[in-house]
């Protein structure tokens, strides 16, 4: 399993992007905060996003004044691989 999946926040960001396709950074942060039912420090959140972009798992583009994030093919593969791994654990008899 790749290193980014060892971080719960990064994994959850990727899962949200997998579901949504593409999201503005603030929209993604708000969705994650609602999921966790807690506030996430902006520096920590955007640090996680920057790490995902740096690893080639997420792309970042500018749309007006907003940054928009989307999974790359490698990011999609990572989410699907993790889902398969998790499903095997849950389906084990």
Which residues does each predicted region cover?
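Short acidic, hydrophobic short linear motifs in intrinsically disordered regions
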Residues: 23-33
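Short alpha-helical segments that sit at the start of domains
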Residues: 1-18
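Amphipathic alpha-helical dimerization/coiled-coil segments
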Residues: 80-93
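Short, Lys/Arg-rich nucleic-acid/phosphate-binding segment
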Residues: 62-68
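A short, conserved structural fragment
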Residues: 53-61
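Short, hydrophobic-biased segments on the C-terminal half of alpha helices
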Residues: 46-50
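Short helix-capping/hinge SLiMs at alpha-helix to coil transitions
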Residues: 17-20, 35-36
């Amino acid at each position: 399993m790749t290193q980014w999946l060892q971080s719960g926040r990064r994994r959850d960001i990727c899962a949200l992007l997998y579901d949504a396709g593409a999201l503005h950074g603030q929209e993604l942060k708000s969705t994650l905060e609602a999921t966790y039912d807690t506030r996430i420090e902006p520096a920590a959140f955007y640090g996680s996003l920057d790490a995902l972009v740096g690893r080639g798992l997420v792309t970042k583009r500018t749309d007006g004044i907003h940054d928009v994030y989307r999974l790359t093919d490698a990011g999609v593969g990572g989410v699907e691989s993790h889902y398969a791994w998790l499903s095997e654990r849950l389906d084990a008899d």
